[in-house]
């Protein structure tokens, strides 16, 4: 059965140089795979100021970051398709792509996949979790035709 996806894209920056809605949807669908029958999530594209504020308020890090994930936790006994929210900072993604010599589209795909995996419960706090998450990201992204995001460019 195909994933029934409700994707809410919010642009708090000029969407001129950003991926298309179709690209975002493709990346989300690939990241979620066949783990769910239906899912709802929001992806908000923000500037460095908003990213820094959220990163400071929720993670205690006073700097903008590439992607923040906010998983939705349903009350016990309630089954809801809400996955949560991703907040992606456009300028950080662009700067990282330049610094790391990556194609901008490939880095956007990586950030969306990475964030979605966090919403599914993956993490990279310890080495074993990081290896598992990075291996899955690499498999998903190379399956889309992008290079391994963890390989030196």
Curated annotation (Swiss-Prot):
Its EC number is 3.1.-.-. PROSITE patterns: UPF0054 (PS01306). It is found in: Cytoplasm. One of its GO terms (biological process) is rRNA processing. Its main location: cytoplasm. Single strand-specific metallo-endoribonuclease involved in late-stage 70S ribosome quality control and in maturation of the 3' terminus of the 16S rRNA. Belongs to the endoribonuclease YbeY family. This is Endoribonuclease YbeY.
């Amino acid at each position: 059965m195909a994933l029934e996806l409700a994707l809410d894209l919010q642009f708090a920056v000029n969407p001129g140089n950003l991926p298309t809605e179709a690209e975002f949807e493709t990346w989300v669908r690939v990241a979620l795979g066949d783990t769910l029958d239906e899912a709802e999530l929001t992806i908000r594209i923000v500037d460095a100021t908003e990213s820094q504020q959220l990163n400071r308020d929720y993670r205690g890090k006073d700097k903008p970051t590439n992607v923040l994930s906010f998983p939705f936790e349903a009350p016990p006994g309630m089954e809801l398709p809400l996955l949560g929210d991703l907040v992606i900072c456009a300028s950080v993604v662009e700067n990282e792509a330049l610094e790391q010599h990556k194609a901008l589209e490939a880095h956007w795909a990586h950030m969306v996949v990475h964030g979605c995996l966090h919403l599914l419960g993956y993490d990279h706090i310890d080495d074993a979790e990081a290896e598992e998450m990075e291996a899955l990201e690499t498999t998903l992204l190379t399956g889309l035709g992008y290079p391994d995001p963890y390989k030196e460019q």
